[in-house]
């Protein structure tokens, strides 16, 4: 399908909804072999899987955006070299979620961690 369109494609790993896991090696191969696949969002909840996406796509001859799909993994994704996250809770707390990215990019790791921690606290209010 990706080869049939002239649009950038981001792969989406959400095994809880699909029943299938998009393996890191598969993400690497698809990003390598299909020009317009430009990234992947990992909502598996498996930090090691997210890290493997980042590590394996870093080996490619093109820039690939790896995004955390779990709100609690945004800062980890950034620290590992990923592009950030697409967070569901950003719809409710956009400033707090954006602050994780903004602080990280500014070199303020304490501020980024505080914002990441705030998301975890806010999440607890909805359980």
Language model: regions and residue ranges:
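Catalytic alpha/beta core domains of metabolic enzymes, predominantly
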Residues: 2-7, 17-127
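Conserved C-terminal portion of the radical SAM core fold
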Residues: 13-14
């Amino acid at each position: 399908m990706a080869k049939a369109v002239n649009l950038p494609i981001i792969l989406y790993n959400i095994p809880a909804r699909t029943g299938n896991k998009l393996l890191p090696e598969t993400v690497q191969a698809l990003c390598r072999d299909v020009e317009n696949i430009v990234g992947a969002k990992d909502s598996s909840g498996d930090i090691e899987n997210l890290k493997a996406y980042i590590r394996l796509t870093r080996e490619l001859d093109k820039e690939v955006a790896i995004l955390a799909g779990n709100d609690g993994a945004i800062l980890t994704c950034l620290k590992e070299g990923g592009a950030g996250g697409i967070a569901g809770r950003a719809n409710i707390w956009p400033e707090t979620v954006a602050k994780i990215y903004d602080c990280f990019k500014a070199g303020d790791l304490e501020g980024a961690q505080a914002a990441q921690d705030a998301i975890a606290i806010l999440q607890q209010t909805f359980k």
